C-alpha cells in the first residue's frame, strides 16, 4: 500500500526537489542580465549586496541574484558553470540542511554558492574538510571565485602559527579541517587574553563528507592533554608477564570488544607478579594496595589480544600510530586513552611515551552544534538520515544526478573460504587487466590490502596500493585509478574527496612536470594521452570497483560503489564475500554456513541466494543500530559535560573581558569568611563550644590573617561581629598589597590568579568526571539508571569544583609574596606558551574510549579507587574510604570536615 502511494504522490524527498526546481527557474531567468555585466560590474555586485543587507534586507531576499552572480563568476574564472542540480544543492546548504550528491557531481563547486551568500554578512563562513590536502586544494581552486568577487579566503592546516591562523579565520571564507577547528576552539579557551584567540564567534559551517565527520568520527573526542606520571618501566614489566599467560587465562568477546581474566588467569598472573616482586607474596591482585596494577594488566591484555598490527595500528619510525577504522588512514597525533597506547608501545618494543591527563576535550557532536547554522554535503547520507535529524536536527535531501547513472551494480558472490574468494577476485582482476579496464579494489584494512598486493605480485600484475602507509601520495594515486590498465588497491574510503576520472586526471599529472623544459609541449602531450586513454577505458567498460568484504555499514559500501560511474560514466561494481569475513563470522547468522552446505556449495563455487543477502543486510542493520545507540548514548552523557564546559568557558571569557576583578574577590572573601567563622562558631552554640584555636589556624591558612584571640574574649561579641572583623582584616591585607604595588598591577595579578586557578580546578574536575564515567554503568546492577546517577553526581562534583575554586583563588591572592610588578600580561602569555609546549592533541579511540560505557574493562577498578559509597566505609580503616572530598565530613566519625581531621596533612 505504501509503495503504491509513493508511486502516486512521490516521496517527501521527491516533493522537496520538485519545489526547489521551481526556484531554479528564478535564478536561470537572471542569467542573461548577469552575463551582460562587465567584470567590474560583476565584482561590484558584492558591494551592492552588502549595502542591501546593511539596509535591512535578508539573505533570502538576495539569494537568487547572489547565486546567479557566483555562477557567472565561476564560468569566467574557472570555466565551470553550475548545473541546475548544483544550484539545488546550494539552496539546500544555504537552508541549513544536508545535500546528498553522487560522487563526481561537483560538491566542491556547489559549496561556493552558500559560502559566498553567507559570507556577505561579514561574520565568516567555515568550509570544513577531512584532511589538509583537501583544505588546501579547495581554498586554492574555489578561492579564485571568491577573490574575483571581492571576498577574502583563508586556509587552516596543522602546524600553523597563531598569527597566521588568526588572519585566516578573519577572512570572509575559511577552509579548514574538522580536527583543526575543534583543537583551535579548545586552545582558545585555554588562553589568557582575547587578543591571543584565533577563532571568531560561530556563524555558519558547510561540512564536506558530512557523514564521515558527524557520524563515523562522532564517538571520537578531541583531547588536549598534558603529561603526568612516568610509568614506562611498569608497562614494560607487565607486558613481559602478560606474554606468559595461556589462552585459558582470559576470555574475550569480539562483539562487545571486551576481555577479562578468568579465575585461573588471576591465580596465574598473581604468581608471575609475585615472582617479579611487583606484588608482595600472599597478596591478591585485587587487594587495595595492588588495585592500580589491574589497570596495567587489563591494558596489556587488550594490546596483545584485541589489537592487531597493520589492522588497528602500525609501527612507523619507532612510534605506534593508530589507523582509522573507517578510512584506513593514519590518525596523526591521536593516541589511545587510559594507558592503552603505552601498552601497545610496550608490546611493539618501542619507546613508551608518558601518559597524559586531559586538560580540555570535546566531541564533534558538541563542537558542531555550536554553529547557529550548519549544513553538509556527501555522496551517502540517506541511510543515516534519522540519526542526522535526531542528533543534529539536520534534514537530508537527495539531489538527482546531472547525468543518468549508467553504472551496473552486480550481485554479490559468496564463497566458503577466503582462499576461494581471493581466487575469484584474482581471476576477475586478470580478465579486466588484460582488456585494459581499470580496477579499484576496496579492502577493510592495511593487512588485507597488503595480503592482496602480495597475491597480485606473484601473478605479476602491476598495481598501486593506497593505504595509511602511503597517505602523502593518496590523492595522486586515487586520481589516476581510472587510467588504462590501472589496478589500485585502497583501504576502505582512502582518497575520498578526490574524483577518479576515466583516462586519468590531467591536472595532477601536469603538477608533476618540470616547468623549465618544454612545459607547454608536455602539457599538450599529457592531455592528448589522457583523451586517448579515456576512449580506451570507456570501450573496456569504465572503472570496475571490487569490494573484498562487506563493511559494517551499508553507507561505506555505497561510498565504495560510488567511486565508479561518475557523471554518467560507464562502470561496474561487485562484492566478493566469504564465510571467513569478519561481518559474516561475528554478526551474521550462525545458520548461514549450514544453509550453504544444504544448498550444495562446493569448493571454488560461488552462490547467489536471497536468504544470504537478507542475512547480510540484517547483520549490517544490526551493527548500524548498535553503533547509532552508542553514539546516542555518548551524546546523552557528553551533554552533561558540555553544559558544564559552556558555563566554564563563558565565565572564563567574562573574566578575561572584565576591567574590575574586585567584585568576585570581595564577594568570595565575604562568603568564605562567613563559612569559616560559622564552622568553628556555629550559630546558637555556647561560647565554650567555640573552637578558637582551629579558627585561627584556618583563617591564617586561607586569608593569611593573624587572628587575635582577645577579640573573642569580649563577653558581648557575636558570630556576626567576628565575621565582620575577619572580612575587614582580609580587606586590609588586600589594600596593603594595592598600596605597595598599585591597583592596576593587583587587578592584573588577581585576574591571572583567577584564570590559572579556574584552569586547574577544571582540569581536576575533568579527571573526576572521567573516573565517574568509567564506573557509572555498574549502577545498573543496583537497579539505578546510570545516566540519572551520572547527572546527579556530575552536578555534585561541579558544585564541589566551584567551592574549591573559591578557596584556592582566595588562598593564592592573600598569600602572594612574589614581586607583583612582574605579573604583566606578557608574563601571563609566556606562562601559556610554556604550558603549550607540553600539551598534546589527540583523538581517542572510539571503540576503547573511556566514553564507551559498558565496554571498558577498567569499570571494575576505577569506581573503587576513586569514590566509595559512604555506607561502605569502615570508620576504623582509612584504606576503605577511597577518595574523600576535603569538605566532606571525615569518615572516622569525628564530626569534623575531612580537611580538619584525617585530611589535615594532605
Curated annotation (Swiss-Prot):
Segments of this protein annotated with the region Disordered: 861-887
Cofactor note: May bind 1 zinc ion per subunit.
Statement: the UniProt record of this protein carries the keyword Isomerase: no
SUPFAM superfamilies the UniProt entry points to: Helical scaffold and wing domains of SecA, P-loop containing nucleoside triphosphate hydrolases, Pre-protein crosslinking domain of SecA
CDD domains the record matches: DEXDc_SecA, SF2_C_secA
GO CC aspect terms: cell envelope Sec protein transport complex; cytosol; plasma membrane
Residues where Zn(2+) binds: 890, 892, 901-902
Xref: SMART domains: SecA_DEAD, SecA_PP_bind
Top-level EC class: translocase
Task performed by this protein: Part of the Sec protein translocase complex. Interacts with the SecYEG preprotein conducting channel. Has a central role in coupling the hydrolysis of ATP to the transfer of proteins into and across the cell membrane, serving both as a receptor for the preprotein-SecB complex and as an ATP-driven molecular motor driving the stepwise translocation of polypeptide chains across the membrane.
Family: Belongs to the SecA family.
Name of the molecule in the record: Protein translocase subunit SecA
Species annotation: Rickettsia conorii (strain ATCC VR-613 / Malish 7)
Source organism phylogeny: Bacteria, Pseudomonadati, Pseudomonadota, Alphaproteobacteria, Rickettsiales
